Amino acid sequence: MMITRDQALQILYEFTKSENLRKHALAVEICVAAYARKFGEDETKWSVTALLHDFDYEMHPDAPDHPMKGEPILASRGIPEDIRRAILSHANYSGVPRESALEKTLFACDELAGFLTAVSLVKPGRSVHEVDAKSVRKKMKDKAFARSVSREDMVNGAADLGVDLDEHIAFCINAMQARAGELGLGGAPSQTTTT
């Protein structure tokens, strides 16, 4: 039985009350779903996986509990094993190696989506439309900025996915720009004029 996106959202909202965590799940979903379309994969399955990857984080914010203790909850809700495995694999300490394209994509998009959100929020218009790969790479060098986001995971995620880091950053920015309003990162696309 395949779960729908709406059912995944219901589970996410049941267990995740923080608006920021909900938006993080949505940002990761947006990036992962864009890759599903690019790779010709099952967009619903990939979206569901991304939406649920941190559903248990408020209950179990520390390693190794997250996502291990959430997995039985998802199993009891009928979430397919391949989705649960991908969710487990997004945690480096889980011992579950990332093998499938879904698993690699989820890992590659998780930290990056959070970082792109953080970069967007420090822009004057608080908008993802003001973000580009160059500004993201510059912020990656600032260890005090979004210090909880692993730069190593962002770099390794792109490498494991077989994608150039700058291309990966730009791809995810473009995906998030298309749905910026849902993320609270809409602002307005910047207008440039030449004189």
Language model regions located:
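Conserved active-site and cofactor/substrate-binding residues in soluble primary-metabolism enzymes
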Residues: I3, Q7, K23-A27, D65, ...
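Non-catalytic terminal extensions that flank enzyme cores
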Residues: R5, T194-T195
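Predominant activation on well-ordered alpha-helical scaffold segments within soluble catalytic domains
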Residues: L9, Y13, L26-E29, A33, ...
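Residue-level detector of short coil/turn "hinge" positions at structural boundaries
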Residues: E19, E43, P80-E81, R147, ...
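Divalent metal-dependent catalytic cores for phosphoryl transfer on phosphate-bearing substrates
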Residues: F39-K143, V155
